Amino acid sequence: MTVLVLLPGLGGTSELFEPFVAALGSAVATKIIRYPGDAALGYDALAALVRAALPVGEPYVLLGESFSGPIAISLAAEGGAQLRGLVLCCSFARNPRPSLGPLRVLLPLAPIVPRPLGLLSRLLMGRLVTDTLRRSLAQALRQLAARALKARLRAVLSIDVSAELSRVAVPVLYLHATEDRVVPDAALRHIRRIRPEARVVSIPAPHFLLQTRPGEAARAVLGFIRGVVQSD
């Protein structure tokens, strides 16, 4: 059976994948990669961690959510023999907020001031926020040290894997949240310029698409996996 390897968003934990994994059911095997919550690791170090955890001897599809999109792209560009497809969810190939790029040199000095959970929940989940999702978000944030968060934010501000995306040889699916207030539509347009053949599924959802619209996301991903398996 094809394994769907799930690479998490900025928090790096597994809890926020629970609604999506439940919606997938038994239709596909899943493997969730977790990132160390206390280590100041950038994209290269996290990609090495993921590379070492990829399935061996069985086909797999990579799904990079938000922050992890560049990691999924970089690994897909390496052309693993068992890789069958690449899914990007609310993600990007380069810094999605280029106007903030110059601030990366200040991040090591800047204090991390937590935003009120209610405001953060509305930013990430919009009108679809629930108490359960809010608790899951709070749990994920508790596991993330300030130094780890700073390292990941700094990595986002300087990332550009556009060249790697052009070398990806497997089919690409992009899950687009039409109400995303974190990753702008310009990120998708950039990806489509590089990979015009990529399949795009737009879902009326905020940035936390997999959490707030798990059923629709699961149907899109399962349909994509069936397609790449049948064409294999």
Where are these regions (language model features)?
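Short beta-strand/loop motif that positions the catalytic acidic residue
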Residues: V168, Y174-H176, D180
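Gly/Ala-rich beta-loop-alpha elbow adjacent to hydrolase catalytic centers
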Residues: G64-S68, A72
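Short alpha-helix in the alpha/beta-hydrolase fold that links the catalytic acid
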Residues: V170, P184-R193
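Acidic catalytic loop of the alpha/beta-hydrolase fold
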Residues: T178-V183, F208
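Conserved HGGG/HGGXW glycine-rich cap/lid loop of the alpha/beta-hydrolase fold
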Residues: M1-A40
